[in-house]
Amino acid sequence: MVSNSFWLFILLVSFIPISAWAESRDISTLFTLRDSITEGKGFLRNWFDSETPPCSWSGITCIGHNVVAIDLSSVPLYAPFPLCIGAFQSLVRLNFSGCGFSGELPEALGNLQNLQYLDLSNNELTGPIPISLYNLKMLKEMVLDYNSLSGQLSPAIAQLQHLTKLSISMNSISGSLPPDLGSLKNLELLDIKMNTFNGSIPATFGNLSCLLHFDASQNNLTGSIFPGITSLTNLLTLDLSSNSFEGTIPREIGQLENLELLILGKNDLTGRIPQEIGSLKQLKLLHLEECQFTGKIPWSISGLSSLTELDISDNNFDAELPSSMGELGNLTQLIAKNAGLSGNMPKELGNCKKLTVINLSFNALIGPIPEEFADLEAIVSFFVEGNKLSGRVPDWIQKWKNARSIRLGQNKFSGPLPVLPLQHLLSFAAESNLLSGSIPSHICQANSLHSLLLHHNNLTGTIDEAFKGCTNLTELNLLDNHIHGEVPGYLAELPLVTLELSQNKFAGMLPAELWESKTLLEISLSNNEITGPIPESIGKLSVLQRLHIDNNLLEGPIPQSVGDLRNLTNLSLRGNRLSGIIPLALFNCRKLATLDLSYNNLTGNIPSAISHLTLLDSLILSSNQLSGSIPAEICVGFENEAHPDSEFLQHHGLLDLSYNQLTGQIPTSIKNCAMVMVLNLQGNLLNGTIPVELGELTNLTSINLSFNEFVGPMLPWSGPLVQLQGLILSNNHLDGSIPAKIGQILPKIAVLDLSSNALTGTLPQSLLCNNYLNHLDVSNNHLSGHIQFSCPDGKEYSSTLLFFNSSSNHFSGSLDESISNFTQLSTLDIHNNSLTGRLPSALSDLSSLNYLDLSSNNLYGAIPCGICNIFGLSFANFSGNYIDMYSLADCAAGGICSTNGTDHKALHPYHRVRRAITICAFTFVIIIVLVLLAVYLRRKLVRSRPLAFESASKAKATVEPTSTDELLGKKSREPLSINLATFEHALLRVTADDILKATENFSKVHIIGDGGFGTVYKAALPEGRRVAIKRLHGGHQFQGDREFLAEMETIGKVKHPNLVPLLGYCVCGDERFLIYEYMENGSLEMWLRNRADALEALGWPDRLKICLGSARGLAFLHHGFVPHIIHRDMKSSNILLDENFEPRVSDFGLARIISACETHVSTDIAGTFGYIPPEYGLTMKSTTKGDVYSFGVVMLELLTGRPPTGQEEVQGGGNLVGWVRWMIARGKQNELFDPCLPVSSVWREQMARVLAIARDCTADEPFKRPTMLEVVKGLKMTHGMECGPLVVTVSRDM
């Protein structure tokens, strides 16, 4: 405070003659200061008035001829800091706060030896604090907040012994805090928040006995809370939040009896909250959020009689809220979200009548909302989502007249919605509960309601009248209920911005009135039963940005008026019955980033007007009947970087025109598709040569041109495509040779499929030595020469190749011992060639081999002893050679390694012919028996279900394989069959009528899942048993019988507590059904995806249990029996949770048994985006190591809470694996764990160990990944917390 003498001098100044001003140096400096002003003159008008003496200028105070105070606070001068300030040697007070000064502070400030008050806050000052500033020994207040000052705080600050206020927050000052600060015994306020100070707080700070306010928040400080804190008995406020302090809260904290504000949140503090904290009678605000506190909340908290605000969120308490909290009569805010709380909400909280905010979200609270809460009439916000609360939503909630936001989502509330006559209510969320009944017509008595979230419930009825009075409603989400009727047109009269009605039973036509809305930006009506055409009036909704009407029954053409939706960025009409041509008007929607019209019946050409979509980065027109050529303008939208509003990052750069009837050549303008990453043109009638211009698309990661009519060379360009991982050119008419330098052209190729062409020449030796290649298929060509398994330089080499098929060519020569370099091979198929010589003993070294076919060659000699001992080998064929052993069945004879075995070299052709006749006769008998058995079983099944079904999806005319033989390349394989003896218990015999009744004619009400191979319905069988019925997609035998038989073979053989058991099946006509045990708690994905704005977050013990259990299930598939099973689609949505949250691996719709019964090659994508291992590209090969990668992604989901792909992971390339690597590379490992996951020190160590295993599982190179047995072993060690180095070894224990 300025002394009285100072104001006396101000009074006397008026008696000084004006003529004396001219003699003052300060006056001259004032004119210099004025002349430097270029901005803000309007705020300083009298400075430029010649009649006004300088000492009367605004903000200027003089004593005699001397300027003693300059206060230009908030005057927008926006200029470099004035250098002339140092000339005002009599200056006592200087306030330039909020003036917009920039640049560094001048050393001349040290000349102001009389300065007592300095405020330069809210400017744009840079550089260090001048050393000369520490010479201002009269200084009492130094305020430098909100600048960009840098450097360190000098120990010279100890010279400012009169300092009472030091505020340097919101800068970039770094380094450690100088202990010399502790000598400033007059200091009352110390504010250093939001800098980058590091190290610990010096113990000397305990000498600041006058300190009232201390704020060191948002720095990088470490260590424990400094021991001298208990000496600061005058302290009123203490904020140490957002640092890295460790240890416990000292019990001596209770000695700070004057403390009114204590903020220690967002640190690494551990242990219990001390009982002594209850001694702080004056405390009004207590923040302990985002630490690692454990144990119980102390009962002594009731002693905080002045407390108004308590935040203990994001901790690891394992206790109930103490009932003593009911004694906090002044409490207005209780925030304890994600704090590890359990038990019931204490009814005593109803005594805290002043409570306005209660946030207990994401805990494990149970029971109903206490009746006593009805008296909390001051409530404004009530958040309890993500618990296990049950009962009805109480009707007395209408007493909360001041309530603005109520969030009850992700609980187990049941019954109807309550009456809500709350005039101030803005937001009501009760999603993901068990609410039933219809939406009451009085819902809009809350006439201020802006947001209503009721998705994922069991609501029924219609909404014909429900929302008519909601005149302020901007967001309505009814996703996944059982609401039926038509979409009402009155919704257009509401101020809705977002309308989400997907996954209900809405039927009828789209209302023409809906498109009259002036506000709707997002509409999603997917997965309903909406019929009829898309109305012409759709074009009236010109502000619309996202429109999703996929998977309905819409028919007719796409209307021309869609072109009036000029703001549209995302349009999905996928999976309807739309016909006609793609309208030219659609291309007036020039903001489109994603356009998906796939799986319709569209015809005609792809219009050249597509060039208007310059922001397009995802175009999906697959599975239609489009014809004509690919327009030269197709690439215009792919010339630019990805649009920021693109919905799915994994779809960026996707150009998919597959499975149409396109003809002609790929246009040379394809070179302009610079941003295309995935190019799918398979399944068309394209011809000509592969354009050399493809070699200019350096961002390509995969190309699929299979099943077309291309001719000419397979690789017409010579420059490298360094990003390309998948190249699939099978089933064309390509000729010529494979370039000798293919390894340089495709340096990172992982999947290369050149099968079923007319290629000639040799197989380049360098191709097999590519460091990235793991799938190579050159079968059914005219290749010749030797297959070189050694590298050109002759050096020893460990290949990463997993799959090699060179069958049905003209290869000759022998197999040499260098094949031992290919230890990762799981499939080796060289049948139907002209190989000669003996089998190399190195074949026994291929320990990963599970499929071996060397049949129909000219090989001779003995079988290497170790062949039959390869653990995973489930199929081997040596027939058609001069070798006794034809298949693995011959291993049972046990004589192939004996010293007195047959002399295979001397085997006469006569014996070979005789043996062939014998085998053919035996095979003929077996085939007859199998055919008769199949006929018998089919007739028996058909009799049990005479009813015919309509196929789930219409068969499309494509160039895909139409039979098993065609898919397998007419290889000799065992027939697909169902071995009913493999099932442990008798299967349920379910009739078609049972299924129709249980699913109400396949009503969408019963849908609980929809995968690539089938839709899953929740149903109750006649005897009352709840089951899940999977209706397999498929309109022909390859897509129906094959998946059905594979599923039966797979699940029937598998019995494990962590796998979903198959209960029965049903066959009728083209329809195939599987009946599974119903899993009460849904999928892991459902529990992980949503948190503060969605579903409940699982605690770490639950996540670790789920991780270990699902690993055991997958390990059993890989190693539990022969033949081994590959899942092919391992993901969080395929891990189901029973009533005890025990995990069960589900959905073997993509499973393949690697045996003679089935191929392991597929032309479809195996897996789901985000889970597919990098070696797949557009994979046609599945391996156990691919499953391991996918499971590693699931582990990362459990650790981080993030989805496998999305906007959040943009730093890592749009996927979770990349983001985790990006975070770890920057030393941010502790920041990648799920922020909604409270952890103790033990849990943190467990999480770090699981992260290490997950990183091994998601290694780019398959051979670096562990087996699932090793994963189980590592997780078991982690679960038991055997401390010390983590050593993962193979264990047979699952």
From Swiss-Prot:
Active-site residue numbers: 1129
UniProt cross-references to Gene3D superfamilies, sorted A to Z: Phosphorylase Kinase, domain 1, Ribonuclease Inhibitor, Transferase(Phosphotransferase) domain 1
Matches recorded under Pfam families: LRR_1 (PF00560), LRR_8 (PF13855), LRRNT_2 (PF08263), PK_Tyr_Ser-Thr (PF07714)
UniProt tissue specificity: Expressed in anthers and ovules during meiosis.
Positions of transmembrane segments: 917-937
Membrane topology annotation: Single-pass type I membrane protein
Keyword tags: ATP-binding, Cell membrane, Glycoprotein, Kinase, Leucine-rich repeat, Meiosis, Membrane, Nucleotide-binding, Receptor, Repeat, Serine/threonine-protein kinase, Signal, Transferase, Transmembrane, Transmembrane helix
Example of a GO MF term: ATP binding
UniProt note: phenotype after gene disruption: Male-sterile phenotype due to the absence of tapetum. Presence of extra microsporocytes in the developing anthers and ovules.
LRR repeat boundaries on the chain: 88-112, 113-136, 138-160, 161-184, 186-207, 232-256, 258-280, 282-304, 305-328, 330-352, 353-376, 378-400, 401-422, 423-446, 447-469, 471-493, 494-517, 519-541, 542-565, 566-589, 591-613, 614-637, 649-673, 675-697, 698-721, 722-745, 746-770, 772-794, 822-846, 848-870
Known function: Receptor-like kinase that plays important roles in restricting the number of cells entering into male and female sporogenesis. Involved in cell specification during anther development and initiation of anther wall formation.
Family classification: Belongs to the protein kinase superfamily. Ser/Thr protein kinase family.
Name used for this protein in its record: Leucine-rich repeat receptor protein kinase MSP1
Protein source organism: Oryza sativa subsp. japonica
